[in-house]
Amino acid sequence: MCSVAVTGASGFLGQHIIQHLQLNAPWVTEIRAFDMTSFSKALDYKSRLDVSIYTGDIGDTQALRKAFHNVSAVLHVASVIDVQFQPDRKLLRKVNVEGTANVIAACQTEDVPILIYCSTISAVQGYFNCLGGSETDVEDTWPLLFRDYGGTKKEAEWMVLRADKTPLTNGGTLRTVSLIPPTMYGEGDRLIATILQYASDNNGNFIRMGNGKNLEAYAYVGNVAWGFVCCLKTMFNDPNFGNEKMFIMDDTPPQSIQALSKTYLEDRGFKMTSYYIPLSVLFLICLLLEMVCLLISPFKRISFPLSLSAIVFSMQKFYVRYDKAKTLIEYTPLFSVEESNQRSLPYYRNVKLRK
């Protein structure tokens, strides 16, 4: 019997993890959903189990302890993603670092033997190209491209792995693993939805930024969620497995966000412009904006989505492989690239856009 608590259960990835626990993990006997917003099933599937809903802030240790009491495992997915210029550093640290410390402490106090942490590729991505790299190839990356977001996630990952093999109050041991997904797409995603919104606001035309020849790692969210279930099963069956970190990818080809979005834009009757704004021009504009905002920053914090880091990201070739996950947790993508696309299309076709 395996009882599982999922933090960030109401979010993009959390919803898909709950779905796979319902449909593809018959050995799981209880599911608990912890989030700031009360969990409500957002995906179309038939539930096998009633989900126990726990509403609370990740900074509330008592709420975490209540949610984790007598569970077999915790999947810690809750986090703040902020890669814009001048992100909210206090919030990033409060949720990603201090929140993770609270999760670890609650696991130790409530005798939870399994903790699986959701990291991010931003915790290993720097100012260099990486063509099919492994975990060890990028282990000591510094500086990080998205310093604040990636830095807090990297610090939290380090805390989780350092907690491996710590004693529990019942005499047992806490085992920990960190899973590292890339940027994800699929049902619930807001990144491509934002691109659709930009096109809608511009009479159905998405103005390209750069030539789109960069190569970045993307994965279908359903496959990433399946990776968490594979890891959970491995750790549940082998109490000695832990202190590992690994990429969770699928077979989505490395490509630019423009290429990934093209099908979904066209499906809604939108199109990309034949011309594009050179990244060098965007870089200079962004540099000037950042300099002005930094001068103002002692008096007022100004944030905006475009940043120098985002421009550099759009110039890179950075993708990794998931051989380690194949070997250690017997993970293979549940959905092919074609199936992932077919599952994603209805969502992007119907996602609500502002008029």
Residue ranges of model-derived segments:
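Amphipathic terminal alpha-helices
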Residues: 320-328, 332-355
